[in-house]
């Protein structure tokens, strides 16, 4: 089988362009999908009762035509993000709406509007083919991919790609994601795989590390610097743990908000000292029907922060959980 030949070539250590450019491609490949005709399967259930094992499928899918600015990658490892979980339980909306809208953009985006959605927003792997306009990447190169898919035809995105009106999260708002044997990405999503990391290690940071970097470090983000005090929500999770480590590496002081003693220990193990267990403190920032905030609870949180920092407010808030923690 062609997939077996691709796997064997990668495991052999041969990375010559000629070898990979001439490897036969399979007619189909295995991919993790959700199906458009099942978007109502969890209707009426609470979020915690929706089981992704019922909605996720392993399907044989065809390889679509490659666009001029894309690369076809043999996936060696991928990772799970919350957007994959959201996709699998069709919350807060079905991702097929994203695919339908993207499909109206141009000839090549039309490929994404399918009755199935291949999920996954991280990968490490080896380039197999490149589109006609790709010059940096060649077959045989080991790569990782970040999740931001952009068109960059609009000037709004030239200084900051997050401002591109056509920016999307690959594998969430686009099709052909990374939880598959093969994946299609835009060439500008690719980066060289770090030689000192395993396939699994290099596949896991793409989405969360780049997001945390954009928020905290980049010139378009908070421009974190020595001495800053940073309030980090969800500090033990994927995004939060990178934010915590970045703050420590920059000589800043992270104030880590977590939800359990176990998660607090994860932060301590990373080197953080100032930690707030929000469940132990009993914070309730919104009323029972989530229509109004409670200012006194935010004031109580502020008092706790100042107790930990010696009377200082924070310089940066690293917020990513969503509405409940928007003060």
Where are these regions (language model features)?
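Glycine-rich beta-strand-centered segment in the early N-terminal region that forms part
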Residues: 62-79, 93-156
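N-terminal Rossmann-fold NAD(P) dinucleotide-binding loop
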Residues: 120, 240-241
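A short N-terminal beta-strand-loop micro-motif at the entrance of redox/enzyme domains
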Residues: 6-24, 39-77, 110, 115-118, ...
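Hydrophobic/small residue at the entry helix of a nucleotide-binding pocket
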Residues: 211, 238-239, 324-325
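NAD(P)H dinucleotide-binding glycine-rich loop of Rossmann-like/cofactor-binding domains
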Residues: 109-114, 121, 149-234, 281
